Amino acid sequence: MFFEGDQAKHLFELVEGVLRIFKIMADGRRVITGFLYPGDLVGVSLRNRYVYSAEAVTPVRLRRFSRKAFEDTVGSSPELRLQLLAYLSDEMAAAQDQMVLLSCKNAEERLCSFLLQRLQRKQEQDRSCSVVDLPMSRLDIADYLGLTIETVSRTMTKLTNKGIVSPVGRHSIRILKATMLSHLAGDGDECDDGHPSVISLDKARRRH
């Protein structure tokens, strides 16, 4: 879609599909800072250039807006200004959550938190349905969590051996003990185990 440093002439609303947003470090390493889903805005910046890169994880459909037209519209609508403020507040909260995850949690806690975020996002839409799509690759997950692919795979195997998750086919994982997963994530008992959960690994709070 665009690269960090490109002139920010447009912003976008994601209509369909999943995007990853990322930054490239001076040494060439990629750091994924979030995943975006339908309804999210992409490329919102108070600067004249994009502050991150964005690319598709799956085929996507986007609604494109001229930055100037968007700013003019928001400037003339108190309601839209409040909505934009709420969006930016959510972005800040998500960034703070990610800082906590990377600075305070070990590998197991990070992966458990990642799985819980996907589960909770799906259950916000339909509490009775526990199937969520994760199109991002293991490398994407590793780059988002600040881990190596090997650590992600090893930790997933550990959770499987503990009976907390169970592979379902080639690209799915069933969460058998959501409360235990929440405990291992260091988040407390935020989920109930009433509904076993299936998380698909081959199809992909905001930016999670």
What are these regions (language model features)?
Residues M1-F12, E16:
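Regulatory nucleotide-sensing modules
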Residues L11, F35, R64, P135, ...:
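Short aromatic/basic micro-patch
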Residues V15-E16, Y37, T58, G169:
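A cytosolic small-molecule/anion-sensing beta-strand core signal
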Residues I21-M25:
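Cytochrome P450 core scaffold surrounding the K-helix E-X-X-R motif
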Residues I32-A93, D97:
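Cyclic-nucleotide recognition modules
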Residues G75-T148:
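Polybasic "coupling" helices that flank or enter modular domains
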Residues Q120-H208:
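Phosphate-/nucleic-acid-contacting segments
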